[in-house]
Regions:
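Short segments within alpha-helical structural elements
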Residues: 194, 223-250, 358, 366, ...
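Periplasmic alpha-helical coiled-coil/stalk elements that build and connect Gram-negative outer-membrane
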Residues: 22, 140-142, 149, 156-277, ...
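A small-residue-enriched
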Residues: 22-45, 76-136, 239-248, 272-343, ...
């Protein structure tokens, strides 16, 4: 009886100790995510956890918004402030809790019974006991290892979401800046069309042009007004998209942009060995590898323990009706007669094969995507160069020659205005080509895992730590 009492006390004590020591770290692997991100892009990230550092981040964002936005500043604001990204960071806390839970023992079960004798001369029968799931204790190391692998998978997934956000913000930035320039250009086209229509009205009043020519100029003018309205709507939509990505609202939405799209870089980044670089650096591919690793481990654990069912050990004590106590250990073992976990094994085998095939498919898709983006980037640069060196100079030459003919009275004012409008139209196509180049380049950066080969970002030095945190570090 003394041994059994000590055994019962030991179970309770160990359970309380383990439960008392188990705590969920607040950091939840975020530093690992920061390391993964900083290896690929030169931006700061911050997890809003209601600390003093959050105030420093708010101040930093206010300072950044005082100046015209650049692609780098827009990305930095989004990484610090985007609420969807903050929600994704919470996945770290959820999975960290799963890791902690995997290291916990199941709670012991205490039971008691009272039996009433059918003879009034005898005392009641009492029985008390405590049991513990012993299989849960034996499998604890395997559970912790499996949950750790899944935690690593989630960290890779979260870091990949940051890389995706960088690309989305850069694409949104160049979209809105291109829309701004196109809107300004469409405004000039509308003004030119308006001047042409006013001239047509005067000439028509003087009887120098026909009704058809007047109506034609009117139609051109109204069409230019529609195109201007369409460009203004596109600008507003693009601006709101960037505002959403940066997580701004209220007075913060009154941010400013530069006047024009940046020129193309003078030299393109190296275009060799891009596929292998992408396969090596892509975090979503690394996360899928972790998924395969986790399923393989889960399958191995299930196979190893398929013949071991539920095992419960404990101790119980009973007072008989004659007031004598009977105490001893208890053992309950599940016999795997009907269910040897065949279904679990088959399910995990299928899930593992599915994950392996997904991994192969994803690697193929990444290689294909990189090749496609490389081709598009080359073609887009060639298109921009063709507009700059050939199309635009030709349009300028047409305007100059038409102006000379107009001065010599060899052509009419409408021809000159039409030539100028066509020059504007060509310039709009040129702006769209530059915009699309930068969007494709942002996609290429994402496709390669975050960093372009041979390309260094300008680091955004934004302090997001409190002085106290800096001292700790």
């Amino acid at each position: 009886m003394f041994f059994c009492t000590r055994f019962m006390s030991l179970i309770v004590f160990l359970t309380l100790v383990v439960a008392g020591c188990a705590q969920v770290p607040k950091e939840a692997g975020f530093n690992d995510v920061k390391d993964l991100v900083e290896q690929r892009v030169d931006y700061n990230i911050h997890w809003n956890q209601q600390t003093e550092a959050d105030l420093e981040v708010e101040k930093a964002i206010k300072e950044l918004l005082k100046e015209e936005l650049t692609p780098e500043v827009s990305v930095q604001i989004a990484l610090l402030n985007n609420p969807n990204l903050q929600a994704i960071y919470e996945e770290l806390g959820i999975t960290q809790a799963d890791v902690v839970e995997a290291g916990l023992l199941e709670n012991p079960v205490i039971f008691g019974q009272v039996r009433f004798p059918d003879k009034s001369s005898e005392d009641n029968n009492y029985e008390f006991g405590i049991t513990q799931n012993f299989l849960n204790i034996l499998m604890q190391p395997s559970r912790k290892k499996l949950s750790t692998i899944r935690f690593e998978q989630v960290k890779l997934h979260v870091a990949n979401e940051v890389i995706q956000m960088v690309a989305e913000v850069r694409k949104a930035y160049f979209t809105v800046l291109g829309a701004k320039q196109i809107r300004d250009l469409r405004n000039e086209i509308a003004l030119a069309a308006g001047n042409s229509f006013e001239l047509a009205q005067r000439l028509h009043s003087a009887g120098n042009i026909s009704d058809l020519e007047l109506v034609t100029e009117n139609a051109h003018f109204e069409q230019s007004r529609l195109e201007l309205a369409r460009s203004e709507t596109a600008l507003l939509d693009a601006r709101e998209q960037l505002t959403r990505l940066m997580g701004l609202w209220g007075e913060q939405t009154d941010w400013r942009l530069p006047e024009q799209l940046p020129d193309l870089p003078s030299d393109e980044f190296p275009l060799e060995q891009l596929e292998s670089m992408a396969v090596e650096n892509r975090l979503d591919l690394a996360a899928e590898r972790k998924a395969v690793e986790a399923l393989a481990l889960a399958l191995g654990i299930t196979i190893d323990w398929r013949w071991v069912g539920q095992i419960e050990v404990g101790v119980s004590t009973e007072r008989e009706t004659d007031r004598t106590w009977v105490t001893g250990p208890s053992l309950a073992i599940e016999l795997p007669i009907f269910n040897q976990r065949q279904a679990d094994i088959a399910r995990l085998e299928a899930q593992l094969r599915r994950s392996q095939k997904r991994l192969t498919a994803q690697a193929i898709e990444i290689r294909s995507e990189v090749r496609s983006l490389r081709n598009r980037l080359i073609m887009q640069r060639n298109m921009v160069d063709h507009y700059r060196r050939t199309v635009l100079p030709l349009r300028e030459q047409i305007v100059d020659l038409t102006l000379k003919n107009y001065n010599y009275m060899l052509t009419g004012a409408f021809d000159l205005l039409m030539a100028k409008q066509q020059e504007f139209e060509a310039y709009q196509k040129y702006l769209e080509a530059i915009r699309d180049y930068w969007i494709i380049r942002a996609d290429m950066q994402r496709s390669l895992g975050g960093r372009l080969p041979g390309h260094m970002h300008s680091r955004q030095t934004i302090q997001t730590e409190t002085a106290a945190e800096s001292k700790k570090n």
